[in-house]
Amino acid sequence: MHPAGLAAAAAGTPRLRKWPSKRRIPVSQPGMADPHQLFDDTSSAQSRGYGAQRAPGGLSYPAASPTPHAAFLADPVSNMAMAYGSSLAAQGKELVDKNIDRFIPITKLKYYFAVDTMYVGRKLGLLFFPYLHQDWEVQYQQDTPVAPRFDVNAPDLYIPAMAFITYVLVAGLALGTQDRFSPDLLGLQASSALAWLTLEVLAILLSLYLVTVNTDLTTIDLVAFLGYKYVGMIGGVLMGLLFGKIGYYLVLGWCCVAIFVFMIRTLRLKILADAAAEGVPVRGARNQLRMYLTMAVAAAQPMLMYWLTFHLVR
């Protein structure tokens, strides 16, 4: 057909235009599974509404966690093994603590390390200047001595332990400056100091037993009081390294007198405590022995201080 005829026919008879039909894909509602899906997709469970509960107002709440009973039922073997292992560990810890306390009083040792910086400073001042101190009584609270950090007169193990370690280090320094250092010699220095301390404690305990002294002075108290002499020994050796023998003898002499006064005033209250409480005169024969014992212990401290340090200064 001619194009002009086609145009005329189109003008005379209007034709309906066909639009392509659009097929709408149904939107799946939350919680509805895809009919073409064989298995549930658990990886996107939270996006489909399984991981949270929705309130009527649109607020979502987190999913409830499984209860311990449900967790136990899920894996009973491992949970029973874990519970059994925890029970064994607790029983073992209790048994070890009980056996350790039988030989080493851990709970009592905690008292002797209950110190702070202020106590250490005041105690060191008391060891170097005991002449300025007036009240030497140990404070008690409900028949129990207060912690050392609250009472400068209470014995502690922190200062003696640190002083002993520092003494060994200073001895190694002194031997090194004299080209005499060796691990064996340093070990001999430490073991000899520890051996003398052990002999002191045993001798005092035996003397207290022979004199039949009823005192609250314990073995740990003796170790604490006898360990304070290492502080003066450190000062003497350091002054000897800096100023020679003159500085050594001056500082060590001062520390020897100070430790003698400190031990007399401290042990006198411990050893003669029962006699003073009973009102027994100090001039009695029994109390005279106690006074001699106190003076002997105090006099032994300067002698040991010199014996353990004189060879370190040249």
From Swiss-Prot:
Residues 1-12 have a biased composition (Low complexity). The modification N-acetylmethionine is found at residue 1. Keywords: Acetylation, Disease variant, Endoplasmic reticulum, Golgi apparatus, Intellectual disability, Membrane, Phosphoprotein, Protein transport, Transmembrane, Transmembrane helix, Transport. GO terms for biological process: endoplasmic reticulum to Golgi vesicle-mediated transport; protein targeting to membrane; protein transport; sperm flagellum assembly. The chain crosses the membrane at residues 157-177, 193-213, 220-240, 242-262, 293-313. Residues 178-192, 241, 314 are extracellular. Pfam families: YIF1. Its main location: endoplasmic reticulum. It is a multi-pass membrane protein. Residues 15-25 have a biased composition (Basic residues). Residues 1-55 are annotated as: Disordered. It is found in: Endoplasmic reticulum membrane; Golgi apparatus membrane; Endoplasmic reticulum-Golgi intermediate compartment membrane. Functions in endoplasmic reticulum to Golgi vesicle-mediated transport and regulates the proper organization of the endoplasmic reticulum and the Golgi. Plays a key role in targeting to neuronal dendrites receptors such as HTR1A. Plays also a role in primary cilium and sperm flagellum assembly probably through protein transport to these compartments. Interacts with HTR1A (via C-terminus). Interacts with ABCB9 (via TMD0); this interaction allows (but is not essential) the ER-to-Golgi trafficking and strongly depends on a salt bridge within TMD0. Belongs to the YIF1 family. It is linked to Kaya-Barakat-Masson syndrome: An autosomal recessive neurodevelopmental disorder characterized by impaired intellectual development, absent speech, hypotonia, profound developmental and motor delay with dystonia, poor coordination and spasticity, and visual deficits with brain MRI evidence of ventricle enlargement, myelination alterations and cerebellar atrophy. This is Protein YIF1B. It comes from Homo sapiens. The lineage of its organism: Eukaryota, Metazoa, Chordata, Craniata, Vertebrata. The gene is YIF1B.
